[in-house]
Amino acid sequence: MVGSSDGDQSDDSSHFERGVDHIYEAFICPLTKEVMHDPVTLENGRTFEREAIEKWFKECRDSGRPPSCPLTSQELTSTDVSASIALRNTIEEWRSRNDAAKLDIARQSLFLGNAETDILQALMHVRQICRTIRSNRHGVRNSQLIHMIIDMLKSTSHRVRYKALQTLQVVVEGDDESKAIVAEGDTVRTLVKFLSHEPSKGREAAVSLLFELSKSEALCEKIGSIHGALILLVGLTSSNSENVSIVEKADRTLENMERSEEIVRQMASYGRLQPLLGKLLEGSPETKLSMASFLGELPLNNDVKVLVAQTVGSSLVDLMRSGDMPQREAALKALNKISSFEGSAKVLISKGILPPLIKDLFYVGPNNLPIRLKEVSATILANIVNIGYDFDKATLVSENRVENLLHLISNTGPAIQCKLLEVLVGLTSCPKTVPKVVYAIKTSGAIISLVQFIEVRENDDLRLASIKLLHNLSPFMSEELAKALCGTAGQLGSLVAIISEKTPITEEQAAAAGLLAELPDRDLGLTQEMLEVGAFEKIISKVFGIRQGDIKGMRFVNPFLEGLVRILARITFVFNKEARAINFCREHDVASLFLHLLQSNGQDNIQMVSAMALENLSLESIKLTRMPDPPPVNYCGSIFSCVRKPHVVNGLCKIHQGICSLRETFCLVEGGAVEKLVALLDHENVKVVEAALAALSSLLEDGLDVEKGVKILDEADGIRHILNVLRENRTERLTRRAVWMVERILRIEDIAREVAEEQSLSAALVDAFQNADFRTRQIAENALKHIDKIPNFSSIFPNIA
């Protein structure tokens, strides 16, 4: 017909075709210029297409004109029309003859070897016939023309394939029998292939035909069974195609196919999840069970987990509460899947998951969950508590709940034990909940049983969870943990073995190192136990390996290294009671290592611990310094010894007046550590400054030549920095240490005179004199005397015997 969407020619062109009857003028409507379908006659005998003349009469009424004949302009007394039945029958007979002729022409033309123009014209005739009179589709089916059109999909011409697709769509519209014929063989597979291999117009025609076929429920299964069909259709709906029609038709095709639960599951696998969620919300109990079960097996990205939790979270929680065990199992597995992301876990909490979850976990009695499902419940609970949620007001951290958790850990198998330990890991990671967990563990004495998990070898996840939990507990239960580790054979050695494993750095190694690092550093028994198991040799080997780049594992390297350094530093706290500690530090040049670690920029704790260790090492220097042997005295020398000049020994330590080295006597001066420690006095972390200041103060201790110590500090520009620390008054502890050092520095008269007029220094000392603790006030008073801010009464009033 004229004006069709694919550019088909009108019927009046068909008279050029062989075997096609001429169009008689009486068949043509004067208004539409087309062959009439429903001719009617006016009172003046003129004949028009019914729809066209009715439209004409309406225009007359709307414009206020009397009805008239559009051909003669003659006014009519009535708008009544009479059907021209004889003419209509004649036209139908004529059309039937022509349609039969055109179909015959089409059958002769639809061969791949024919000219493209003949094929295109034949396809056009078929479309015209189907659009003109729907009953003629029966003729198309009987002529087996559909199969001939399908063959045109094999053409090498894009245009022929495109027109063949359009023709098939017209043929099957509203005709299930034609759809069934088209779906025979590999036609649907070909259409699916066209979705990705054809140009845009061809893809649009292919998806439009698939949409028509999908209106038949029987063919939905056929389409869904074609490999790649669903994933391509889903891909088209989510594409940014400029052809909106392709996206729309693909979407509507998938909507038609949602009647099949199997196809819905496949769609979900390819990312189209809403149909599955819809059935989970509104389906029958059997359907809900099926959808929930599949959801529990489906890989989901984090954004989708949030969507699922928001959409069906409440429904899944309701299923979990039901008395039907298969439904509870399906719901638990789905909730386990979507609770593993922080965003979705928070949504589930808002949907009320905690009360039934806790009930399922702890309940014993009728309809009790089997152990395998309790494991799933424990996993969900572990997922939820490890997102950092504020459980302060939740019943989960009540004393009774924590005790139940500890009891359950002691009375279940490894799988559930692991998940319950992960629950406690999450609770002890939260500042608000950790005190309650610590209290419950202390009062129940559970630390002994928790420590035993360190030795588990057949379940890596269980061991990791236990070590992470103990690491979280260690700042609050360090003494109890140290006692437990020393009191039971094997656990300490197991921790050391984990730390020393020759693998890329793991989370377990970092947690184990962090756990040992938190234990009391002055616990002699623990340090001796570590010496017995060779822990320090293994620790220092790991530290060297990390610094030299031999040990990999970027994710956990910083916490692991920090833990190792803190463990290693503990050996410097037992010099007075354990001779092996001195020997170890000498043999492994520990002082040099800590000196290098001072420069670990960005790792404040490592710098702080290294400075603390250097302080401890430096305090031993005076005991370890070797005095030079006196020169041999001969007979003449003994006679004239009273007039002989004193023997001068070169190379002696400036501060210890003996033979020193960093390795053998831990001397900060000989090791060049003073400048590096002074540099840390400008650190923004006050704890690093405190540790560096304490290490430097070891050069001014009683028993040393304070004047020489001050000179060494001055040469390293340390005095200026120490005075600045006092002026800044950042913390009470730092001020106390700075006042002690400044008082000793001001004993040197030249320095005292130089800084006496500095108002800021005087003000800082006065503030300490007035507000500090008793001991610091006394020291500040002495410092103020050195700069004549307080009179020295002992020099005014001589002692009276």
From Swiss-Prot:
Pathway(s) it belongs to: Protein modification; protein ubiquitination
The entry's keywords: Repeat, Transferase, Ubl conjugation pathway
ARM repeat segments: 134-173, 176-215, 218-259, 261-300, 301-340, 342-386, 390-429, 435-475, 480-521
Matching Pfam families: Arm, U-box
Catalytic activities: S-ubiquitinyl-[E2 ubiquitin-conjugating enzyme]-L-cysteine + [acceptor protein]-L-lysine = [E2 ubiquitin-conjugating enzyme]-L-cysteine + N(6)-ubiquitinyl-[acceptor protein]-L-lysine
Stored SUPFAM superfamilies: ARM repeat, RING/U-box
Coiled coil feature spans: none
The keyword Repeat is annotated on this UniProt entry: yes
One GO BP: protein ubiquitination
Residue stretches making up the U-box domain: 22-101
Molecular function via GO: transmembrane receptor protein serine/threonine kinase binding; ubiquitin-protein transferase activity
Enzyme's top EC category: transferase
Tissue specificity: Expressed in leaves, root vasculature and guard cells.
Deletion consequences: Premature senescence under low light conditions accompanied by enhanced ABA biosynthesis, accumulation of AAO3, and reduced photosynthetic capacity.
GO cellular component: cytoplasm; nucleus; plasma membrane
InterPro entries listed in its UniProt record: ARM-like, ARM-type_fold, Armadillo, RING-Ubox_PUB, U-box_domain_protein, Ubox_domain, Znf_RING/FYVE/PHD
Record-listed E.C. numbers: 2.3.2.27
Function: Functions as an E3 ubiquitin-protein ligase. Prevents premature senescence probably by targeting proteins involved in this process for degradation. Promotes the degradation of AAO3 and thus represses abscisic acid (ABA) biosynthesis.
Self-association state and partner proteins as the record states: Interacts with AAO3. Binds to SD129.
Name of this chain's protein: U-box domain-containing protein 44
Organism name: Arabidopsis thaliana
Taxonomic path: Eukaryota, Viridiplantae, Streptophyta, Embryophyta, Tracheophyta
